[in-house]
UniProtKB/Swiss-Prot annotation:
Similarity section: Belongs to the UPF0473 family.
HAMAP family named among the record's database cross-references: UPF0473
Protein name as it appears in the record: UPF0473 protein SAOUHSC_01719
Organism domain of life: Bacteria
Pfam families linked: DUF1292
């Protein structure tokens, strides 16, 4: 996410982007960024990814992968790290459910 003036409001970016990540075996996996947002309570940026080409299951659901986006000093890059707390998981679930309903 590019540099933002974070205030007390939830900031959401729905621009899709493709990212290449590596799985546990070191294989490249292509993901589509489906949602990106900053949450003022946690003071973190989050990205929600879906594996490119993933098919929905019998309940019409696609597995989403939430990550924390830790930007580097330049703001041009950074790293994605796993979600840290149950509170973050709950917040992410609420944001994703709200965004997917719209």
């Amino acid at each position: 996410m590019t540099e933002h003036n974070h205030d007390s409001q939830l900031e959401i970016n729905n621009e899709e982007e493709l990212l290449t990540l590596f799985d546990e075996e070191g294989n490249e996996v292509l993901y589509r960024k489906v949602l990106e947002f900053y949450h003022p309570e946690f003071k973190k940026e989050y990205v929600i990814l879906a594996e490119e080409g993933a098919q929905s299951d019998e309940d019409d659901m696609i597995e989403l992968v939430p990550m924390i986006n830790e930007p580097d000093e330049s703001g041009d890059g950074g790293k994605l790290v796993p979600i840290e707390t149950d509170e973050e998981w709950d917040m992410i679930e609420e944001v994703v459910n709200t965004e997917m309903e719209e």
